């Protein structure tokens, strides 16, 4: 029975060791918020897009320009003032200075109105894109986290199997030495031990690769991650009960769909913007000009010329070589493409929502079945060990039962992680994935 106690202790240690002083999913996510280069790039793009509204509003504001000039001119006085006798000096230098202040206030420019409407839509699209980037970060962090947990389970199972098989190998050798078993039992145990050693090496290599992938997100190598101490008993607490409810929610709230809707609106506004070049423009224009220093050395007097003007300027486009008509047709084609892209995105999101809902519901059933399979495999191992002690089971039977129990434990852990990941993806498709949802998933890991 000591061997049986060793098996149970090793199987319990698979989870207890992995959660000792380990980082949980939320702490890894908080690190990713600060360190992930892809998310920081999305944040910079979001900040840049906010300036679109300022740029669009600028079309309603006046433009003011100030220009100045300073000139020096050499004049042949005899050529300029013919018939007045000799002029001294023969060449005259004329100095001039000037300044012009002008302002234009748009009164009606249809193109500027459409540009402003476009800028608001572009900001809305940027908002949705940044939210999608945040949801994508949650999914990438969770997937990398669960990948590491899966790899940890593989390593821990391989270690436990190796220890148990080593124990069995040592027992088989002792039995052979005292003559109560054949060399076949020893060879069988040795073959199993060699196989598990190879599997342990492969599992450790896979774990290192998975950790490096998570390192690419949080910019440090994770040492130890918290896994589930036990499987949650309540796996059915979904916000919506039916698949159709999830699909309707996804079609209303999904942010990838909102991005595509904004793209269609921008394309439609582009048609209006191009067509607006047929419209006249009306501007209020004003100018102040001050020119000094004209004349000077010849007449003995300086001239200071000041002019002021204000008025309304009307520009009516009459003919632009059919370029506007061509660009309108081009914009209409882009609008039509955006409409088809929108419908394609809508169908894809509905499909993804259905798939993730099925993954969640099937995952619940799979986890429950694997929990029962684990209990059954433990009972089978108990019976096999007892059978070996009374002589009705062999060493190979014990090894097979042990292998089946470890496989059931590994499959259960991976199915549970897959179920949790499907819940996150389902929330993302419904447009509801945020930190609160991630906290709920993290709580299911820390039971």
Q: What is the predicted function of each stretch?
A:
Residues 5-16:
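Bacterial N-terminal signal peptides
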Residues 23-147, 282, 286, 322-325:
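Short flexible linkers and secondary-structure junctions
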Residues 203, 255, 415:
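Metallo-beta-lactamase
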Residues 41-56, 133, 137-156, 167, ...:
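Amphipathic alpha-helical coiled-coil segments
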Residues 67-105, 230-239, 272, 285-320, ...:
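Small/polar, glycine/serine/threonine/aspartate-rich low-complexity segments that form flexible
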Residues 74, 411-447:
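Acidic, low-complexity, intrinsically disordered peripheral segments
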Residues 20-69, 75, 105, 222, ...:
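Bacterial Sec-pathway N-terminal export signals of envelope proteins
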Residues 136-249, 359, 363, 367, ...:
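Periplasmic alpha-helical coiled-coil/stalk elements that build and connect Gram-negative outer-membrane
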């Amino acid at each position: 029975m000591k061997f049986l106690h060793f098996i149970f202790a090793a199987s319990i240690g698979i989870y207890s060791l992995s959660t000792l002083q380990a980082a949980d999913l939320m702490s890894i996510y908080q690190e990713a918020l600060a360190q992930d280069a892809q998310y920081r790039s999305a944040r910079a793009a979001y900040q840049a897009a906010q300036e679109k509204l300022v740029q669009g509003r600028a079309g309603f504001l006046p433009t003011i320009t100030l220009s100045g000039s300073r000139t020096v001119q050499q004049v042949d006085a005899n050529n300029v003032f013919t018939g007045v006798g000799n002029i001294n000096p023969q060449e005259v230098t004329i100095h001039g200075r000037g300044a012009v202040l002008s302002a234009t206030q748009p009164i009606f420019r249809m193109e500027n109105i459409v540009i402003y409407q476009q800028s608001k839509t572009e900001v809305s699209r940027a908002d949705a894109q940044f939210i999608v980037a945040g949801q994508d970060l949650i999914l990438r962090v969770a997937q990398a986290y669960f990948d590491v947990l899966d790899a940890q389970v593989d390593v821990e199972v391989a270690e436990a199997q190796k220890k148990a098989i080593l124990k069995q190998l040592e027992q088989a050798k002792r039995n052979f030495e005292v003559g109560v078993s054949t060399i076949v039992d020893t060879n069988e145990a040795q073959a199993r031990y060699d196989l598990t050693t190879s599997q342990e090496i492969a599992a450790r290599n896979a774990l290192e690769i998975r950790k490096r992938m998570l390192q690419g997100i949080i910019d440090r190598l994770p040492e130890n991650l918290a896994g589930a101490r036990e499987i949650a008993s309540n796996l059915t607490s979904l916000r919506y009960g039916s698949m159709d409810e999830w699909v309707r929610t996804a079609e209303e709230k999904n942010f990838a769909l909102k991005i595509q809707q904004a793209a269609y609106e921008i394309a439609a506004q582009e048609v209006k913007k191009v067509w607006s070049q047929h419209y006249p423009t009306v501007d209020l224009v004003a100018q102040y000009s001050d020119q000094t220093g004209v004349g000077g050395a010849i007449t003995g007097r300086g001239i200071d010329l000041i002019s002021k003007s204000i008025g309304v300027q009307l520009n009516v486009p009459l003919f632009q070589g059919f370029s506007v008509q061509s660009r309108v047709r081009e914009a209409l084609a882009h609008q039509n493409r955006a409409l088809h892209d929108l419908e394609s995105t809508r169908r894809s999101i509905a499909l993804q929502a259905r798939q993730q809902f099925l993954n969640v519901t099937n995952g619940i059933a799979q986890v429950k079945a694997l929990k029962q399979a684990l209990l059954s495999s433990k009972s089978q191992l108990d019976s096999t060990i007892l059978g070996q002690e009374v002589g009705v089971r062999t060493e190979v039977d014990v090894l097979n039962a042990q292998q089946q129990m470890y496989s059931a434990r590994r499959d259960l852990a991976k199915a549970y992680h897959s179920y949790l990941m499907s819940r996150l993806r389902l929330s993302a498709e419904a447009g509801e994935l945020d930190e609160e949802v991630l906290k709920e998933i993290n709580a299911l890991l820390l039971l």
